[in-house]
Amino acid sequence: MKQVDYLIIGQGISGSFISYFLLEKGASVLVIDHSPEYSASKVASGMINPVTGRIVATTWMIHELLDFATDTYYEVGKKLNENFISEKHIFTIPPTLQMHEALEKRVSEKNTFIKNISNAESDLLKENFHFYFQPKKIQPAFLINVQLLLSSWKNYLEKFDCLEKSSFDFNALSLKKDRIEYKNIHARKIIFCNGIETFNYTPWKNLPYTITKGEALIASIPGLDENFMYKSGSLSIAPWQNDTWWIGSSFEHQFQD
C-alpha cells in the first residue's frame, strides 16, 4: 500500500507544475500518466505573448503573470539543471487594415509591449515575408521549451518514485470520507490534470464543456532567424525542435479525432 498526500492524474504542464509546487511545500505526491504520444501540452508552441485579440489588448495582470512565470521557469530550470525559458521578441505582421490600425493605436498610446520596428528589422523581415502594412514588435515575449520541461520533470518524478506510468482507471477510484483510494494507493486528495480525458468521468460528464482542437504544422524554414518569433493575425510561427518551426494553430469545434 502506497500512502501519499496528493494523487495527481496527468503530467502535462498543469500536472507538472502542481506536483512541483506541492513537492516544494513538503507534500508527498504520486503522478499517474500514461505518456500519450500527443497531448495538448506536448504539441503546445510554448509562446508567451503579453497582448491578445483583434484589438491587441494587454492581457489582464500581465506584469504580475510575467514576473511569476519567468521566476518559476527559471527556478524549475535551476532545480533540474536545464533552461526552459528564453526571451524572444515577436514580430507581428498585420494582415488587415483593422489589425494595422489597432497596432498603430496601441503604439500611439505608448503601450508597454508594442513598439515600432527599425528599418533594419523591416529589411530583415522582407527576406522571408511579404507584407503591405508595416509590422510591429512585441516585447518582451517568451518561448518555453515545453517538451524539454515535460521530459525533464518526468525524469525527476521517476527518480524519486513519484510517477506511475499507466492509464488511469476511474472505475478503480473510491472516494472515502477521509481519503482517496485507488488500487493500492491511499491519498488525502486527488487532482485531475488530464484534460479532455476527464470529460467522460462520471462527476463531470454532464457539464457543458466545449471541446476544441488545434492543429499545427511543423516545417523547415531555412534562413528564418530563430532569435525571434513571428505572428500574423491568428497564425504564429515559433522555433520548434531540430531546426524546425511550429506554425499554427487552427481552432476547431467539430472534429472526428
Region annotations inferred by a language model:
Residues G10, D33, P94:
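Short beta-strand/turn micro-motifs composed of small residues
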Residues R54, E82-F91, N119-N155, E164-S167, ...:
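Helix-loop-beta segment of a Rossmann-like dinucleotide-binding subdomain
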Residues K25-A27, K159-F160:
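Conserved dinucleotide-binding and phosphotransfer motif residues
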Residues S14-K25, H34, K42, M47, ...:
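Active-site substrate-recognition segment that forms the wall
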Residues M47-E127, F131-Y132:
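Dinucleotide-binding Rossmann-like beta1-alpha1 core, especially the glycine-rich loop
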Residues K2-G12:
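Beta1/beta-strand and adjacent pyrophosphate-binding region of the FAD-binding site
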Residues Y6-I8, V29, W245:
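Conserved hydrophobic helix-helix packing surfaces used for dimerization/oligomerization
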Residues Q139-G233:
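Predominantly flavin-linked oxidoreductase catalytic cores and closely associated redox partners
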